[in-house]
């Protein structure tokens, strides 16, 4: 959503890929983001991606599609691999087949700090070894390396942003920041009296999603494609977040 708004502000014609005519998010997008034209497609179906690219003829493609909740990836590992990992390959292959010298497409892949997993150094950089510890992280590693492979093998302008946690009021309440803020609001209104959390000492690098999408856009405006870590450089404990809320 933030990315669509930034691109619209920059004067882009914005298309959004959506799976199925009856997708429950379609009405919300049409109402709140009328400048976005929805195009049907599926990261599990190469032919639909080719058709979508042929119709839209984009100059830039941003892939934020994923099964993005780490805990869910353990329960749906195959689906996570198929969408979050192989979906990147299908999209890059579609770009390779549809694009060309007459329409060079620039591609952004949303990689994740979950790829680092078992951390070997702090802070992590673009050169830190990857050691994912979840199906989600593993799928992101596949997508990340596939992006590099298509850049080096086919000369595509393809780059990855290795994003640390990016939060906003639009975040799903299954994520800890929104779980806390939602619970605090409900407690204030007398709708509940407590919130159950996991490890309060866990530390995260939390940034604002609205800032991070600007970094995504800037990455596709450079002369040469490359991969970049996108983070604040500061970590805070969950307990700090709870106290502030």
Predicted regions and their residues:
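N-terminal Rossmann-like NAD(P)+-binding domain of SDR-like oxidoreductases, especially those catalyzing
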Residues: 1-166, 210, 220, 243
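NAD(P)-dependent short-chain dehydrogenase/reductase
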Residues: 119-123, 133, 145-221, 233-245
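His-Asp-centered acyl/peptidyl-transfer active-site segments
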Residues: 224-226
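Conserved metal-phosphate-binding beta-hairpin within the catalytic cores
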Residues: 230
